Amino acid sequence: MTAPAHLRVLIAPDSFGDTLSAVAATEAIARGWSAARPDDHITRAPQSDGGPGFVDVLASRFGTVVTETVAGPLGASVSARWLHDTGGEVPTAYIECAQACGLHQLGGGPTPRTAMAADTLSLIHI
C-alpha cells in the first residue's frame, strides 16, 4: 500500500520532560517531517497538561505573554509569566502557577515545611 501524495499531519506533543518544551518538540518534529515529506500539510498543536509549559503552549496560538516579579514559595522574588488574551468576549488571564510556586523554586527539594509554604497569592494579585 502506498501513501497518498499529500498527507494532512497533526503534530501535537506535550513536553519531553526537562529536555524540550511542547512548542520546541512540535517544531522539531515538524522540521523532521517536512524534510522527509515536504509536500504534506502540517498542523502544529503543542499540548500541555496545565503544568510547566502551559503559558508557552497557549502563547503559540494567541495572547500576549506578560512577565511579572512575584514572591516565590520561600518569599524570594521570582520571575513568573502569564498570558493576557484580549481576543475573546472578555479579557482573560491564563496563569501557570508552577512558575511562581513550582517545586523547582524550592531549591534543594521540598520538605514538609517548604512544601506548605508554596503560595499562588502573588500571581493572583497581578
Language model features with spans:
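Glycine-rich anion/phosphate-binding loops
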Residues: 112-122
